[in-house]
Amino acid sequence: MTHEPLVQFQNVQLGYGRQVVLQNVQLDIFRGDFFGLVGPNGSGKTTLLRCLLGILKPLRGQVARAEGLRIGYVPQREMLDPLFPLTALDIVLMGRYPHAGIFRSPRRNDRELAMQCLEQVGLADSAHKLYRELSGGQRQRVLIARALAVEPNLLVLDEPTNGLDLPTEAAILGFIERLHQHDGLTIVLVSHVLNVVARYASRMGVLLDGRLLVGDAEQLIQEQVLEEAYGVPVCVQRLDHHYLVAVREVERADGDG
């Protein structure tokens, strides 16, 4: 990680109309970061993500983006009508639209790059299979390939392992980690699953009562912070340089069934 900021939130207030969701957001995403954003459902993760992507404007404050910033975005799920006979390659080619334009046919170099992205995620052999016929893990890899086709310097993933089985989840997260470590790609990983972010992120943000707490994982993966954010007693353990977070069992009073 360098100290070159790709995105800077400066005293930002976010919300919808008169409803304020987050306030006084101070956040720098640096080149080479692996930044994890966590918080319970309804805490404002989607709102902050929409602002990061440029979809939602701040109510107050400023969001500064580095010149030449290209964001590849992997959504939770792709809402495609199953009647559309789109192949995996068709989906990945969508990532070329910012470069080529929506109404222009993909050029040879666009197709070559899309195939390279599919190969990168291990799905070159499935390029011409219908997207709707792929497994959940394969679909997620296709969405990552589409984001890589943007040729991003910042990759944003929203709940990338939601609904996947454990082996597929581990494979997807391992691939994301390799993109960061070997390719030097800056990562923002959004998840409600603490253990996912705790294992991979070097810096993180925790959403708490309309505020964003930012720091190193070691600073924020503390029982007091997480209990306040999630409203349940937790236990934090560190194993092999990784954190394990679990809900603490509460002793029942005598006579409770």
Regions found by a protein language model. Name each.
Residues 191-192:
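H-loop/switch region of ABC-family ATPase nucleotide-binding domains
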Residues 155-159:
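Catalytic Walker B motif of ABC-type/P-loop ATPase nucleotide-binding domains
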Residues 151:
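Conserved catalytic motifs of ABC-family nucleotide-binding domains
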Residues 229-257:
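ABC ATPase nucleotide-binding domains
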Residues 53:
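Helix-to-loop junction immediately C-terminal to a conserved catalytic motif
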Residues 130-134, 138:
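Conserved ABC ATPase signature
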Residues 93, 108-126:
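Conserved ABC ATPase "signature" region
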